[in-house]
Amino acid sequence: MDKEILTMEEAAELFGVSIKTFIKLLKEEKVPGRKIGREWRFSRLALINWLASGDSQAYSASETEVKEFFNKVAPQWEEIGRNYSDETLKTKLIELNILKKSMILVDLGAGDGFISRFTAPFVKKVIAVDISGEMLRELGRKAKAGGIKNIETLESDAQDVPLADSSVDMVCANMYLHHIEQPELALQEMHRIVKPGGVVFLADLYEHSDGDLMNKMHDRWPGFDPDQLVAGFKRTGFQDVRYEMLPGPPVRTYCGSTPEPVRTGTKVFIIVAWK
């Protein structure tokens, strides 16, 4: 029989979200619960009834939907994302001269390892973080086939990474942020785990109006205005923040077992931010 009274950890699991996201719900959405001393307790029935009402379902579903989508498409991701991973990013990483042999680099939303596998030879260690276990298995398979041995994988919500404060030298986030329910929370997590003097390299979509794309790719955001995102980095505490639009043709993305183009005309930008 299921427990009727739940701890915060058990309640977050019921919602299908991270502890950090659940705490935000507690503060903003009046989740039914009772604080006894320093501990929270929740009625399973009350939570289920709350989840069944109104827009609250979106919060619990968002992380689960993204995870299920990427678990499903992982075996075909090399074809689906063929033109989603811009080769120009590799050139920019080299041009910026920010990869060092002594570095521990975290790749948030690593997917099948487009960034992880490229950067691994240039750094001491890569920690590839993704919410999808199937994607990480694809990454591991491809890394092994390529003889790459310095990538660790970590299945985790990238908004709540189980890494110590100021413990890594660099964070990469390629085509990750538009899948996140709360982008500013993700920026705060990047700031938390990177060392003083460390750097974040982010690539994402310029804002667009392609609703069909968002539905097919389970995007939470229609890209971003880079100026607003730069302001978000600065609010989070990053000291030196720069962005540029990538040159070249717009991104083309494919979705489905028989690849079918679903995006044209969407540009990509990068942000480089030092703590």
Regions found by a protein language model. Give the residues of each.
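Polyanion-binding surface elements
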Residues: 1-20
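C-terminal alpha-helical "lid/dimerization" subdomain adjacent to the S-adenosyl-L-methionine
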Residues: 78-81, 201-272
